Structures are given as C-alpha cells and as structure tokens.
Amino acid sequence: MRSHYCGDVNKSHVGQEVTLVGWVNRSRDLGGVVFLDLRDREGLVQVVYDPDLPEVFNVASTLRAEFCVQVKGVVRARPDSQVNAQMKTGEIEVLGKELTIINSSEPLPLSLDNYQNNSEEQRLKYRYLDLRRPEMAQRLMFRAKVTSAVRRFLDSNGFLDIETPILTKATPEGARDYLVPSRTYKGQFFALPQSPQLFKQLLMMSGFDRYYQIVKCFRDEDLRADRQPEFTQIDIETSFMTSEQVMAKTEEMMRGLFLEMLNVDLGEFPRMTYNEAMRRFGSDKPDLRNPLELVDVADLLKEVEFAVFSGPANDEEGRVAALRIPGGASLSRKQIDDYTKFVGIYGAKGLAWMKLNDLTQGLEGIQSPVLKFLNEGIVNEIISRTGAQTGDIILFGADNATVVAESMGALRLKAGEDFNLLEGQWRPLWVVDFPMFEKINGSFHAVHHPFTAPRGVTPQELEANPANRVSDAYDMVLNGCELGGGSVRIHNQEMQSAVFRILGITDEEAKEKFGFLLEALRYGTPPHAGLAFGLDRIIMLMTGASSIRDVMAFPKTTTAACPLTNAPGFANPQQLAELGISVVKAAKTED
C-alpha cells in the first residue's frame, strides 16, 4: 500500500511518483488549494491538492484530523520561500494525484496537539491515540533500537538468549508476588517472577556460561514515577568471571550504547564505595552532576550546650552533617521553613541553618538561631570544612545516621535543582562494597538479595559477625538513577545456608522454599556473577522522559490499573469455581 514512509521522502525523490499511507495530522484550504500534513511513524510530509483534479480535490476537501488515507502523487521541491526548516521533509511536498480514504475518524476524545491538557487517565485510556503523537512514537522506536543494539552487543560477545519460566514459585525477593492460582492443584499458586534470578543461576550450573534475556518482571509494590507492576530487565549472568570482569563488560556495553544512540561518550566510569557515597551524598545512587556535598561536623559539636547537636554527635548511631549552598544566604525565612518541611518528609525533626552575610565582620556577619551555642573556633572550622563563603548558607541535619542521610541527601538534590547548580549532562559511576546486611527492627535483611556473595569470609566468619561484612556487589548509577545492579553469587551450599540463617530463614523453611537451589549447589556449581539493568529506566533517561510510563507502550497507572482494558477485573463464578477460589467481600462499616 505504500512506496515510502512519509518522513523519509526527500529532495532525492523529486520528480518521482510515491504512494504514502498514514493519518491526516492537519488539513487546511487556502485559497482553493488543499494542504494536508500526512503523518506516519517516521514523520510528516505536506501533500497539496489543487482544483485541476476536481474529483480528487473534492475528496481532499472533506478530510479531517486523524482520517486514515492513502495518497498517490509526485514529489516536487518547494520554492525557497516556502521551505520549512522545522520539518524533516520541509524542502519538498507531494502534489497529490489520487486519494483514498481508508477510514474516517470521529472527533478525538483527547488532544494530540495540546497533549498537556490531557489527564494521565485519558492518555492511558486512549493509549492507541496517545501513541500517535510523534514524541511518543519516537520514544518507542528509540526503545526498539536500544534493545536491538543490546542484543547485538551481547550476541557478539558470546552471550546466549535463553528464556526462563514466567509461571514459577514464590520466593522472598523483597516485594510482594503476583500470584496465579493453579486449576490442577487446588489451593496452590504459581508466582510471576520478580526476576529470573534463580533460573539464571541454575543455567550457570547447567554450563551455559554466558546468558542474557530481555525479560518481563513483576512486582506487586507501591508505585512511584520509576516503578511499574510489570517492567523489563536486561538480565545478564556469567560463569568464571570476576566482579571486575562483569563490570568491565557491562560498562563497555553501556558506553557503546550511549555512543551509538546519542553520540555521547560517557568515558570511564569512576568507582565509589557505598560508605563514601552515603557519607558525601546521603545516597547509594548519587547524582554527581550536583556539586553539593554533606560534610560531617559531629566531632566539633560533642560539647556544645545544644542537645539537638550534641545528642547525635555523642551517639554511635547518630550523625551531624552540614550542607553548604552557594548563594543560599538570599533564602527568605519562608523558603528555609519550606526546606524544613521538606526534610520532615524523610523523618527529620528540624533544620538548623547559618547564613554567612559578611564573613569580614566575623560572628557579627553571621545570622543563625544556633549561633549562640557555638564559639568562634567551632564556627570557623565548620566554615572551613564546608568551603563556605560570604553569601552562602549552611544547613545542618542532626539525628540518627539513616535519617540524616535520607533527609539531607534529598535536600541536596532539591537545593541543586533550585539553585541551578547541576554540572554536565551525564555523570555515571559504579557504587561498590555494599554491606551484606542491614538491620531493620532488630532483624537482618539482605541489602541486595539472599544470593549475593560476601567478600573474603568463610561461612563461619560471616555468621559470627554478619553486621560488618561487605558484599561482592556493584550498582551502575547515572545521574542519580540506578541503571542496574549485580553481584557475585554464592556458589557454595554451606555459605548459602549460612546467609539464610542470618536472615532468619530456618533450615526447614530454606528447604521448603529453596530446596532445589540448595540441591543444585551440591553438584559442581561454578563461580558465577551477573547484573540486571532496568530497560525502562535507561530509555527514560536517554529520551529525557519524566516517567517510565512515557517509554512503555501500555503502562499501568500509579494504582496498578489499566484504564484501556479496565484491568484488573472480576473473574466470573465459573472460573473461580474451577480454581477452588471463593471471594470474601469486605464487610460494610457503619458510620
């Protein structure tokens, strides 16, 4: 039905007859000549119909936006005065000779031109219309090119694309599982995989030493701008490769991807330990475009008569951190109060501050509600450590270390945006040396997942002192987003059992949930390591989209619903009976 895509017609086709199909983007009658912009996935082209062909002209006069049509005509160059440099096809136009209306269109329930006026609900309900917008089409085409480039790289490096099961067994990986009831085994359930983690490890045990898969994963968790109930991973696993080799290979892939797709050379990725990232930036995925850093000052404040500072300063689990904002002395009291409310979201009880109005006047040139508790030596040392100057403000977070990191790390990002401090477009890094475990409510939890190997300890040493052990794990971070995370895996049954015990998983529970893995670890398991990238997040960053929903064809809402299909929906009674399921309706509450 077509000879060319609309967006591909150019000056080399002048004088040629072309057949185009697509949608009417805009139609206008100017002085007896009908101009229409015809659109397909590759772009727009202007088609002109004049009254010399009255039958065709009359049909062209009836066209409205989003009519699906076929056009036959001859390509001609536009006069210099009519060249449109804003259009890919702006040097030419097509003189229409034939016109077929394939399908008409009713008035659209949403605007494709002023899409900002469309609600998120509208855009998702009529997603097939929203995807006609060039911006959306270009993102999905970009995504297709990225996955093609990833496959090409991995294929050429000896990786095998192997599928793993979608219907599997529930395993504790951090989020809630989506469960699928079994008809043949009443009362039993499959789980949709949160990742192919265990299956790809089993593939390593099977001898397939380089595996990859671009795979759907499912997590029933609270949603944010960068979360969806179903998402896509670039999943990679290797045998007989160290963490350094895995990092080198995947960094090579990512650098090549950015060079090919965006003509951007990311350069060599720097390394940063988890502890350094948390200390300097309050985050294990720091945005290095932001020059602001947290500075520890607790050692200066142990003896001050201000419990807000001295309490955390003398607490082993406490922290007092200072954040210098260049030019921040211009902040009004209301703006400081807004920052105080902001850190409160992350558990902070308040925000102390110090405005450096004129350092040539000593303490007289400093404005701060906490200045009366600090002597000149302490103030000067804080100014020296933070590198603050006249016109700056220093903000203080004082609490347990976790609250300080989360609240001041978030404030660092906000202040960097508010004061336009971001430097450079792309700042990648590797974060390494993560702790093996974190303690939550008195119990140990895996920082990555239960199959991550510790670095340089025996199972006995790990169980004797789990709190201070480092894992052989690594995260790739770009502009404050975690692109992917991975680790060396445990390939020894004794070590795996030790980790389960530390996590409070009894031997009986481990056998019930992970018996197949523990069994497999008995039969010559090779050392193996891997990494998984979040494809949706990578595309979001590369295209500048504000949400991963804008780089997925048919995403869910923030409440995990699909307005297009009205999913999820109720099952009919017959289906439920076959599955042995009865639905318990919530009891009505009286006012």
Curated annotation (Swiss-Prot):
It catalyses: tRNA(Asp) + L-aspartate + ATP = L-aspartyl-tRNA(Asp) + AMP + diphosphate. One of its GO terms (molecular function) is nucleic acid binding. L-aspartate binds at residues 173, 219, 448, 489. GO terms for biological process: aspartyl-tRNA aminoacylation. It is found in: Cytoplasm. Its EC number is 6.1.1.12. The keyword 4Fe-4S does not apply. Disulfide bonds: none annotated. Keywords: Aminoacyl-tRNA synthetase, ATP-binding, Cytoplasm, Ligase, Nucleotide-binding, Protein biosynthesis. ATP binds at residues 219-221, 228, 482, 534-537. GO terms for cellular component: cytoplasm. Residues 197-200 are annotated as: Aspartate. Belongs to the class-II aminoacyl-tRNA synthetase family. Type 1 subfamily. PANTHER family: ASPARTATE--TRNA LIGASE, MITOCHONDRIAL, ASPARTYL/LYSYL-TRNA SYNTHETASE. Homodimer. NCBIfam families: aspS_bact (TIGR00459), PRK00476.1 (NF001750). Catalyzes the attachment of L-aspartate to tRNA(Asp) in a two-step reaction: L-aspartate is first activated by ATP to form Asp-AMP and then transferred to the acceptor end of tRNA(Asp). This is Aspartate--tRNA ligase. It comes from Shewanella sp. (strain ANA-3).
